[in-house]
Regions:
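N-terminal acidic leader/helix
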Residues: 1-28
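A generic structural signal for beta-strand entry/edge sites
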Residues: 1-3, 36-40
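Intrinsically disordered, low-complexity N-terminal regions enriched in serine/proline/glycine
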Residues: 7, 37-38, 58
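Helix N-cap motif at beta-to-alpha junctions
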Residues: 9-13, 42-50
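Generic alpha-helical hydrophobic packing signal
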Residues: 19-23, 38-44
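Short amphipathic alpha-helices in soluble, non-transmembrane regions
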Residues: 19-20, 51-60
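RNA-recognition motif
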Residues: 30-36
Length: 60
């Protein structure tokens, strides 16, 4: 599992979840509001954590 905090101004959480689930078949992602500016994104069942970290690095 990987959890990161991302700013809403950077990317919409639904868009990011769709991108992750398309790039990593079998992965599941969910987001939780922290406040009006940030959300927490958690990703499970991703087999390639290095590649996931590269994808998330664009938005963190």
């Amino acid at each position: 599992m990987k959890t990161v905090i991302i700013e809403y101004a950077v990317i919409d959480p639904v868009t990011l979840i769709n991108k992750i689930e398309k790039a990593f078949p079998g992965a599941m992602a969910i987001f939780t509001d922290i406040d009006e500016d940030y959300f927490e994104l958690s990703v499970w069942c991703c087999n390639d954590l290095e590649m996931l970290e590269d994808v998330l690095a664009e938005y963190v």
